[in-house]
């Protein structure tokens, strides 16, 4: 078991590579904030709404040292690796099956080989290798205080993280990588992806059409400005009023400027661009939104091309 931390500068850290053994990875469900309102002379209360706030992730781990004088060194190294004040991405790593090793009849010449962390280095099968459990990552920040607990030459720690901007798990890959079948290792079984050739659930680029359907795999909707999505549209006709819609979004409009066939319109979260120049003030501010399953889209003209580049989010 292990965790992988990707820092803001691109540095990638696995605790096992520094001599720390992870006991468990506890990913809590999301904290929910529910608001109610009381009414005078009314029994009960009125539900005003709920929203997800954050998620806690706890990672108990330990290290063993040859000499007790090394304890301070290992302790300070763990602090340096994990206690950043900037967000980082966390991935979960586990073995596919319970660890097994080959039993042999010992002889007088036998010895146990040790790895670089002084743990027995048994001859494992390929099923004993540690793997990423899924294609999700969590944007987290270190939260809390580490209190080392020493017992002999073993020191135990508990690392506490919490999600920052979003409480959701985020797909590492994008819809375009999924469509192009790139980096298959980015995806996992729980994403429920249809890998058959030509499957509609992996199609995110469309040409010469006025309406169609795009599939969103995430269990949490991609409906906020701080969720990754970029919709690129190549217009097929000259117009001064371009209108389109998605199943779960408000009608999106661009009006008051001249648009030509071949113009490249990009919806980059809450900003809109025409051929690289921002035109957000010429829109009705509505943004694309996607929910699990099929999301129908329709334009008021036949566009040359539309491409949906987005990430999927999970509860």
Regions found by a protein language model. Give the residues of each.
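Short beta-strand and beta-hairpin "edge-sheet" elements
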Residues: 87-168
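Intrinsically disordered, low-complexity segments enriched in serine, threonine, and glycine
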Residues: 171-315
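Compositionally biased, low-complexity regions
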Residues: 51, 60-86, 94, 98, ...
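Short amphipathic beta-strand/extended segments with alternating polar/hydrophobic composition
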Residues: 12-19, 102-106, 125, 132-142, ...
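Short polybasic amphipathic segments
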Residues: 2-6, 88-91, 241-245, 272-274
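Solvent-exposed edge beta-strands and adjacent loop segments
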Residues: 1-58, 130-148
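Oligomerization/assembly interface segments of phage tail-like spikes and tubes
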Residues: 44-70, 78, 152-167, 295
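Short, intrinsically disordered N-terminal pre-domain segments
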Residues: 1-9, 94, 309-315
């Amino acid at each position: 078991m292990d965790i992988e931390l990707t820092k803001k500068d691109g540095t990638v850290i696995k605790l096992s590579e520094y001599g720390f053994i992870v006991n468990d990875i506890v990913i809590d469900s999301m904290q929910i904030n529910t608001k109610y309102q009381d009414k005078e002379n009314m029994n009960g209360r009125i539900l005003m709404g709920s929203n997800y706030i954050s998620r806690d992730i706890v990672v108990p781990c330990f290290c063993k040292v040859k000499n007790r004088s090394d304890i301070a060194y290992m302790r300070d190294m763990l602090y340096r690796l994990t206690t950043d004040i900037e967000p980082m991405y966390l991935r979960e790593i586990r073995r596919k099956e319970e660890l097994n090793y080959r039993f042999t009849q010992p002889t007088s010449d036998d010895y146990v080989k040790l790895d670089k962390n002084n743990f027995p280095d048994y001859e494992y099968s390929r099923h004993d290798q540690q793997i990423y459990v899924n294609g999700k990552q969590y944007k987290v920040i270190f939260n809390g205080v580490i209190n080392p607990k020493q017992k002999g030459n073993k020191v135990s720690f508990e690392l506490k993280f919490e999600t920052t901007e979003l409480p959701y798990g985020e797909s590492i890959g994008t819809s375009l990588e999924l469509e192009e079948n790139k980096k298959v290792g980015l995806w996992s079984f729980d994403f429920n992806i249809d890998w058959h050739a030509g499957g509609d659930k992996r199609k995110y680029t469309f040409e010469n059409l006025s309406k169609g359907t795009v599939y969103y795999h995430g269990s949490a909707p991609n409906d906020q400005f701080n969720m990754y999505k970029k919709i690129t549209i190549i217009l097929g006709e000259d117009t001064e009023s371009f209108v389109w819609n998605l199943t779960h979004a408000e009608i999106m409009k661009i009006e008051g400027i001249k648009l030509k066939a071949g113009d490249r319109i990009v919806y980059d979260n809450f900003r809109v661009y025409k051929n690289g120049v921002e035109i957000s003030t010429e829109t009705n501010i509505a943004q694309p939104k996607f929910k699990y399953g099929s999301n129908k889209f329709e334009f008021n003209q036949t566009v040359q091309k539309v491409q949906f580049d987005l990430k999927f989010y999970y509860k």
